[in-house]
Design a protein with these regions (language model features):
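Conserved, mostly hydrophobic/aromatic
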Residues: 131-132, 177, 199, 209, ...
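Aromatic-lined carbohydrate-binding/catalytic grooves of carbohydrate-active enzymes
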Residues: 172-305, 312-334
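Alpha-helix-loop-beta-strand connector modules within alpha/beta enzyme cores
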Residues: 232-239, 336-357
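Carbohydrate-recognition beta-sandwich/jelly-roll modules
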Residues: 1-207
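Solvent-exposed beta-strand/loop surfaces of large extracellular or lumenal domains
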Residues: 108-118, 549-568, 635-660
């Protein structure tokens, strides 16, 4: 690391650790802490000497906005500068360097990679803390290694040390039903009744039903519109009566065309000239409430408490990025940066709603929500198509590339969309005029084939966060509804990428399963994606450290027994399809063992309650929120050294016995 520490030292940084891990910040004169401030610049010559020539190096860039796509790129004429926030990984021939911010709550910042070299900047908007002689930048780190996944794990542990603890020791593993992804803003009270009736009749095990944008009169006027004449308290009561937690969508910092903004113009976020700033959603501009103004903060608290008193305990909070997006903004409290304004606003929400409520922050700043959010969105809104530009492909990439943040919150990959539906929403429905709905005609459509739908559902499992569905349940095809068996209940373990830099979207993912049944050993689920347009089989690029049985739970077939160093080839996978394989460590003694079920992607991790084994039988008990048939498999040793697979079909809430004679 000496070449890097020497280069950083020449840039005037100050080290907290200067060994195999470089931790540092920079002391900046307060007169200079305005706008974009360079923290360091390491020239292309030094980077090349350290093993990272500008053009050949692959660069993984994390991204600030949920709608951006984290991923791996190289410099080109189209992308002469690659930017990342909060972290960037340089990769060249199994040689990796991670550079990232450790602190993420005081000011914005980003990293740049260009033919000139590696650069990091702090973004002080507005000018920082007038009256002080100097300020310190957020701490940063440089880590070096050969495995980018391990570097991100090391980085995550360091980020924990420099940021607030999560709001709770155990995040809620909710399964959420949401209305936006079919109805948009047009859902009515009667349609809610229809959804709840189907959830009850079909025993769909949802923890939360969330009412999305479209219930309110306007942004800032948080009272029900004409589609909800019985009121939102009654809607919450209906959801509770159906056995679920009431959830609701709000955007507390955006201001629509409402009287209170004219009555209290001082509550609006403005620039240095006093002009009220706006954030556009599509073509629609919205003014922004400034939570650093005490009166505005008190008003925000008042409507939050009113919604809480209606009975809502799950809050999807949207468009919070409006507080830090415009570098020209000057908060009422002129001693804070825009990122501190953002965190002040989110803190206001957390303190007002309390720990009883689950906060799902959508469209904010991931780092600055650490210690405040229960859930954050991992990517853009989902649609029921596969297209790379705006479909399932990119949503999976956004989700898995942000999985390292799972130590700080539960990820929300947005709703899984499984339906087959060629008809869009009718333009005659009541589209509330203050809400921008992109491509409303296609919002309710779904064109994923069976393989694509299964892969899109698999994204929820890979995320390891909450599971969310966005369907009109009265019309959902039964065979597509069964896909929910694979992800409900959530297992809560995010997947790790195996082939990080080998493909734009990695093909292989490992999920460590700690089974519900205490007598079963842990195992790994290896998920494989074929994002190509041709059917193909793939060679597993990872390694196994002990003999394992590789089992295909969906097909109830044994792929083989593999030792360290053996080549493991997947089954042929359809275009845009996936395979979920179970890697089971072989017992040291040759005796029968439980292999898998075909119910859930964990292959027995969440639904197997008990297992006991004798020389000739495997007995167990299943317990699931679903009432359905399940295939159960066990492995029995044969005298010739091979293994026999015995299967049985049983109910998902019953005992099972597997016998081999």
């Amino acid at each position: 690391m000496k070449i890097w520490s020497d280069a950083l030292n020449a840039c005037g940084v100050e080290f907290s650790a200067n060994t195999e891990v470089l931790i540092f910040d920079k002391k900046i004169a307060s007169s200079d802490a305005a706008g974009v401030v360079e923290l360091f610049f390491i020239s292309r010559e030094i980077c090349s000497a350290a093993g990272f020539p500008a053009v050949e190096t692959q660069v993984h860039c994390q991204k600030r906005q949920k709608g951006e796509i984290p991923g791996t790129e190289k410099l080109s004429s189209e992308t002469p500068v690659l930017t990342a926030d909060p972290a960037m990984v340089l990769y060249n021939q199994d040689h990796c360097l991670l550079c990232g911010f450790l602190e993420m709550t005081r000011h914005l910042g980003h990293l740049e990679w260009s033919e000139g070299g590696l650069r990091a900047v702090a973004e002080y908007h507005p000018a920082y803390r007038p009256g002080t002689d100097f300020v310190r930048s957020q701490k940063m780190v440089l880590l070096q290694g050969s495995d980018p996944v391990q570097l991100f794990e090391q980085y995550t542990e360091l980020v924990k040390q420099y940021n607030p603890a999560p709001p709770r020791s155990q995040f809620p593993r909710y399964t959420v039903g949401a209305n936006w992804h079919y109805y948009g803003p047009t859902m009515t009270e009667n349609e809610l009744d229809e959804e709840l009736a189907v959830i009850k009749a079909k025993n769909i095990p949802l923890d939360v039903y969330q009412l999305d944008d479209g219930w309110e009169r306007d942004y800032g006027d948080w009272h029900p519109n004409d589609k909800w004449n019985s009121g939102m308290a009654q809607a919450a009561d209906k959801i509770k009566a159906a056995g679920m937690i009431p959830g609701i969508w709000i955007t507390p910092f955006l201001c629509g065309n409402i009287k209170i903004a004219e009555q209290h113009p001082q509550w609006l976020l403005r620039n240095a000239s006093g002009e009220a700033l706006t954030m556009k959603i599509g073509p629609l501009p919205f003014r922004i409430f400034d939570p650093s103004h005490p009166e505005c903060a008190a008003w925000i608290k008042s409507f939050l408490k009113e919604i809480y008193n209606w009975g809502y305990r799950y809050f999807k909070i949207d468009f919070t990025r409006c507080l830090f997006l415009n570098p020209a903004a000057v908060p009422f409290d002129k001693s804070i940066t825009l990122l501190e304004l953002y965190r002040q606003g989110i803190t206001l929400l957390r303190e007002t709603l309390g720990d009883e409520c689950c906060l799902n922050l959508c469209g904010g700043h991931e780092g600055a929500t650490i210690g405040l959010a229960d859930v954050t969105r991992t990517g853009s809104d989902t649609y029921g198509n596969w297209a790379k530009s705006n479909g399932a492909w990119t949503r999976i990439q956004q989700c898995v590339m942000r999985s390292w943040m799972s130590s700080f919150r539960m990820g929300d990959p947005d709703a899984s969309i499984m339906r087959l539906n060629s008809e869009g929403l009718s333009p005659d429905r009541d589209f509330t005029p203050h809400i921008y709905v992109p491509s409303y005609s296609s919002l309710s459509q779904g064109s994923l084939n069976d393989d694509e739908a299964a892969t899109f559902i698999l994204n929820q499992f890979l995320c390891g966060g909450i599971s969310e569905i966005g369907e009109r349940l009265p019309d959902l095809q039964p065979e597509r509804l069964k896909l929910l068996h694979k992800i409900i209940p959530p297992c809560g373990t995010p997947a790790k990428m195996v082939d990080f830099f080998q493909h734009p979207l990695p093909r292989f993912y490992r999920t460590r399963i700690v089974p519900r049944c205490s007598t079963l050993p842990e195992w790994e689920i290896v998920s494989v994606l074929n994002i190509g347009d041709e059917a193909a089989a793939f060679v597993y690029p990872g390694t196994v450290n002990e003999p394992v049985m590789v089992f295909h739970p969906e097909k109830m077939t044994l792929l083989g027994i593999f030792n360290p160093g053996d080549k493991i080839t997947t089954p042929v996978i359809a275009p845009h399809g996936s395979a979920v394989l179970k890697f089971i460590p072989l017992p040291r003694e040759r005796k029968p063992f439980f292999a898998a079920t075909d119910l859930h992607y964990s292959a027995g991790g969440v639904e197997v309650e008990t297992v006991s084994v004798t020389e000739s039988t495997i007995n167990g008990k299943l317990s699931s929120p679903w009432d359905t048939d399940v295939k159960v498999a066990g492995a029995f040793p044969r005298p010739d050294g091979s293994w026999a697979i015995v299967t049985a079909t049983v109910n998902s809430n019953s005992e099972f016995t597997l016998t081999y004679a």
